[in-house]
């Protein structure tokens, strides 16, 4: 959830690289930032402050920021309030060491108590300071090398971590370690880079090593990258080549990343379908289904595990798979699944689909490990190539929508739904559970989605005007049925994430079982009321809302003349198959949330208290 950056080399000053890296990681969410640098005089300088990276830059403007080795961090508070004192890096008591850390040390209180009894003092409320004090204590008392002290300390630690450590007595070395929290090492010519993901690294090198759980990396000037485990057994990490276009992690003329990513969706869907959807041959090809045909064809049950927006995509996947493959599907919050003693295993013909944009979502990764331990076959749907979930699964499909920087997911959602649609079509065709005519019709419609979304994006100005009308609403209700119900959930989530307006998504038919009590002139209701599905039923719901003075924004099929007469505002969508409607209907809801948040003056790309990649529980 926080951001880690590191640099060691002889060619460049570390500070500019660290600051630029932190800026690349701002999308992950944070409340404070800091850097640690070793200068040529072997002084270890730590500078940190509450607030944004820009605040850190201002704080450092009159400080000694020289040096070719350094680490930097953006913090999202878990232990201790957001403050300069609790910000990272943390010194050890001797001030020989500085550490940055993502994750949670679960037994920090016990370790801290023991260290206090041994005479150690603490400056912050964080679990991270406990870890650096432990390393310092071990190193001093046992007269060990930094690596040995780190290994012994990590042996005592319970919890998740990604850490990077500097020692002013060893200014030519950075040590980093990982357990259940992502960490990437970039390898340059005589220099090393470090990041929570590849985005702070790719400007300087495309050669990276994704550290696995239990890995400890030693980056030392003049030497090759060394990776060992806690027992000091040397490992042979795979050096990968990453392909990230720098333009994808810059705004490119848009005021916010979120708006850029909304407008990128037509191209993203083309990228997602390239080489997979062949409308000219009416065929969908997924390598994972070819390589694991028998396992997937023999599935008796599919369990989808995900969190947040990915969970909403999973709900759409459930309907697609059940409709076309005739396989029962259950959709679980990964956080509930992992602790719920689920009945899952290979003996029951279970396939578990794990969905995560980052591929690092802690609860989803834990759910994967649990299902795997019980013998289930695991299929991953992720965006970040080389991330932890794809490496933990049996097979899977990348959505290929490029880096998503805005905290509120947009293009990743439509990418996930596109992959789930392709998965359902390919599996249904292999099973023979879909007619040839229907199969061809859905493929043709899917291939047309990029141009359909381009058409919907033309409503941007209309939606911006509409947003101004509802800027001061305190609550919203979103309604949908069938395939549109998960879209209603996603629309409500987008609004609450970035505008801080309370919003709920509900099945339209359930309105009378509670939510209708909330309807009055102060309650805007967004209703998805296209000609697909249960049009007449949703129209009746809208009439019930209007009878109670509710204000209705309706998403309707192009040319609808009935609902437009009773709704306060309508947004027209092109006609399409019901199963493809989520890909299109979600776009105006993304735009509505975006424009309301902008009107309210909110930080759209970095909403409060949220992180892009949730790598802790």
Question: What do the PLM-derived regions correspond to, one by one?
Answer:
Residues 69, 97, 301-303, 351, ...:
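Structural motif
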Residues 8-11, 101, 121, 139-143, ...:
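Hydrophobic alpha-helical scaffolding
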Residues 1-251, 255, 267-300, 339, ...:
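Conserved short alpha-helical segments that host acidic/polar catalytic motifs at enzyme active sites
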Residues 265-269, 273-303, 395-524, 597-617:
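Active-site phosphate/pyrophosphate-binding segments
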Residues 186, 313-315, 330-332, 362-365, ...:
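Extended hydrophobic-aromatic, low-complexity segments
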